[in-house]
Regions:
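A short SAM/SAH-binding and catalytic strip from SAM-dependent methyltransferases
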Residues: 62-74
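A short acidic, Gly/Pro-enriched loop at the edge of an enzyme's catalytic core
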Residues: 51-62
Length: 162
């Protein structure tokens, strides 16, 4: 399952390694764009609300939510819903931009993200983001900070409360 899939870049890239992928986004426009060049019967795109997913408990081995938790309201509620649909031995892959403590140039980039319709609702440092995941019932199995225009913290997690 990929949440906040946007145009489907990640799902399309990894589809050959999976039996089936459900890729969702809250934006009908993004899903329409993702469907436009989907060539795999193993990949299904749909408009869904990550806070109220239509899937049964423990439906997925892997959930990916990339670059989204910092822009959604109440990311802890999204994590609760992810925990519900993820199998007990499943893996959450949740890279997100970690803007807190950035330089002036980082603040300027955040301003332009807001203008583009992606306001920062959670401004974490890398350490703060990993702490947030742990406080919400996740054990961080792997993490790394990737330096780019915005620093990105990659987090690979498993349920800490099963």
């Amino acid at each position: 399952l990929e949440l906040a899939a946007g145009t489907g870049l990640i799902a399309k890239h990894i589809v050959n390694a999976a039996a089936h992928i459900e890729a969702t986004d809250a934006s009908a426009e993004m899903i329409a764009e993702a469907k436009r060049d989907n060539r795999s019967a193993k990949l299904h795109f749909s408009v869904q609300d990550m806070f109220c997913l239509p899937y049964a408990n423990q439906s997925f081995h892997v959930v990916i939510v990339s670059n989204a938790l910092h822009i959604v309201p109440q990311p802890e509620k999204a994590l609760q819903e992810i925990k519900r649909v993820l199998k007990d031995d499943g893996v959450l892959i949740a890279p997100t931009f970690t803007h807190a403590g950035n330089s002036f140039s980082g603040m300027v980039k955040a301003f332009f993200m807001k203008l583009a319709g992606f306001p920062l609702r959670s401004k974490w440092t890398s350490e703060g983001y990993l702490r947030f995941l742990r406080q919400n019932g996740w054990a961080v199995r792997k993490s790394a900070v990737l330096k780019a225009s915005f620093p990105l913290t990659y987090a690979e997690c498993v349920k800490s409360e099963v």
